[in-house]
Amino acid sequence: MTRLLRLALISLCLVPTAASAHVGIGGTGGFAHGFMHPLSGLDHQLAMILVGIFAYRLGGRALWLVPLTFVSVMALGGFLGVMGVTIPFVEADIAFSILALGAMVAFNVRAPLAVAMGAVGLFAIFHGHAHGSEMPMDASGFEYGIGFMLATALLHCIGIGVGMATGALSRPWGDNVYRCAGGLASIAGFALLLRCF
């Protein structure tokens, strides 16, 4: 028992003490930090996966244009954040984007392509701004931006994969899974929204 206790204490001493939060100080890699930023927050993960599911459900050209719009406009939002441009209520806007995207998935909103691209583009501004404004001071803006854009595209692909897997289920089951997943995401978005005030 004492040997196990010693091993546990030594292991605890080797654990890094830095918190894994959105904002970092000290030496950071621009690309790695940017890549991890969307993956480290449930708000970003939910929204970006929902964009992929929404794009899959729309089908056709929306399958690639909706995620591409999100990533492109998010880069603009990131630039605004890095430049210090203030956008009011960014965290509340991000929470609302989850609520809205969840509802769009749950209710199978069949928006015209331009409307769908406009909606996800609007949401992307806020997500990008959050990424950009939380970039570490010593990170390369270009590398950081490439990192968070790549991670976002990966999350969109996961969402498309989830959409494909759910769509492969038999008729009533697949629709029910979409409704439940979208509804739960909307509830999560609403809960995050309440925390902002």
Predicted features along the sequence, with ranges:
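Membrane metalloprotein/metal-transporter helix-bundle signature
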Residues: T2-F197
